[in-house]
Amino acid sequence: GRTGEYNKKNENFDGVIYMPCLESNGFLPELPVETPDLIYLCFPNNPSGAAITKDKLQEWVDYANKNGAVIIYDAAYEAYITEEDVPHSIYECEGARTCAIELRSFSKNAGFTGVRLGFTVVPKDLVREGVALHDLWARRHGTKFNGAPYIVQRAGEAVYSPEGKAQLKEQVAYYMRNAHTIYNGLKEAGYSV
């Protein structure tokens, strides 16, 4: 990236504010002391599976708006949310339209791995230094990307049909049962999971 040089001593890049997600903090990063211009959050998180409550996510939205930062919110695993206090989108938080970009993928919820279909939400209300980020994104995307193939678009459309929603629900339940089996097996083998 364009953040700075790689520091071999601490194995970090200069110009990046690292936000540790550790077992001791529930795999949820704390608000940084330094002021970032860009914040990346992924919830539910991969690989930890940690999910953020709406109240905690609201703290991040408020922090970003207060400090003029933009949140890149990766919601690829939102279909796996089972808790009621966990938002499925950052836009469930007040003020998120002025500070957040949300990424979605069909790979995780619909099994489209390798098909390469997803979408990005860049609200028109998101403006930095007098520039609407939506307009920049639309221009960049319009000149660099020719769109997903028609058959892939139709498959994505089917995901939102009543039949597609039912099939996705079954698929996610199947994956969750598999995860539960692995979890129980690791616990029985003496691992801390």
Model region roles, listed by residue range:
Residues G1-F13:
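Substrate-binding/gating loop at the entrance of the active-site cleft, primarily
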Residues G1-T3, C21, A76-Y77, S107:
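Histidine-centered beta-alpha loop that forms part of the nucleotide-sugar donor binding/catalytic region
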Residues Y6-N7, L57-V61, I90-Y91, V172, ...:
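Short amphipathic alpha-helical segments and helix-helix/interface helices
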Residues E11, P47, A75, D85, ...:
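Residue-level signal for pocket-adjacent positions within structured domains
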Residues E11-F13, V33, K66, G95-T98, ...:
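Short, well-ordered coil/turn elements that cap or connect secondary structure elements
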Residues E11-H88:
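Active-site phosphate-binding strand-loop segment of PLP-dependent enzymes
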Residues S24-G26, Y183-L186:
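A Trp-anchored, charged/polar loop motif used as the substrate-binding/catalytic surface
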Residues C93, R97-M176, H180-G185, Y191:
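Conserved core segment of the aminotransferase class I/II
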